[in-house]
Amino acid sequence: MTVLAVTGTDTGVGKTVTTAALACAARLARRDVAVCKPVQTGTIDGDDDLGEVRRLSGVTALHGGWRYPEPLAPVAAAGRAGAPLPTRTELVGSVRAVDAAGRLTIVEGAGGLLVALGADGVTLRDLAHDLGAQVLIVVSPGLGTLNHTALTLEALAAHGLSCAGLVIGAWPAEPGVAELDNRTALEALAPVRAVLPAGAGAASPERFEALSAAAFDADWITSLS
């Protein structure tokens, strides 16, 4: 079982685009890859993270789970919809049902590392622990990112979990001093596995495939086990 969890330091940092780019790069590296999004909110506004992953990455082994209409944190969204939340056991089981020998299963969280996903307060950190998964952190290049990233790394280390690296999810076309300095500082915190350009999610599938292949090191993807 090879499970890689993807979290972000904030909303809007590019988790879904990063998930799609990683899945695309893994497909190009000839890995058997699946993407799992156990909890999705905001479906009333047309949010469909797995649909976006499919469109951009060309990966078809996609597995959803619990979906809630309003664009809120999962517990709030479920409460307002009058819908049940999954338990920790159900969430872990949903990912294990997707994984297979030799497969890389990418699990995209909802919100950040410690956002409650289930009825019992289970978080993506808990799922990573139960699944023996490393965690890839998607970060912003802007001000505040160093503190947010350090806090997320500390939260992983406190539970003995391994960080697979960082991805800068939306690198500006014209970075300023803050972005350039932050990029150097982020590289000192953890390996930066990829830097994706801002607006990458609007690219055509062909263009997205090219930028995904260029962004991620195929040897690193192959080594994930």
UniProtKB/Swiss-Prot annotation:
EC number(s) recorded for this UniProt protein: 6.3.3.3
InterPro entries reported in the protein's UniProt record: DTB_synth_BioD, P-loop_NTPase
Enzyme class: ligase
Required cofactor(s): Mg(2+)
Domain of life of the organism encoding this protein: Bacteria
Binding site for ATP: 12-17, 49, 108-111, 197-199
Residues the entry annotates as binding substrate: 41
Binding locations of Mg(2+): 16, 49, 108
Compartmental location: Cytoplasm
Catalytic activity line of the entry: (7R,8S)-7,8-diammoniononanoate + CO2 + ATP = (4R,5S)-dethiobiotin + ADP + phosphate + 3 H(+)
Stated role: Catalyzes a mechanistically unusual reaction, the ATP-dependent insertion of CO2 between the N7 and N8 nitrogen atoms of 7,8-diaminopelargonic acid (DAPA, also called 7,8-diammoniononanoate) to form a ureido ring.
Family per record: Belongs to the dethiobiotin synthetase family.
Subunit structure: Homodimer.
Record-given protein name: ATP-dependent dethiobiotin synthetase BioD
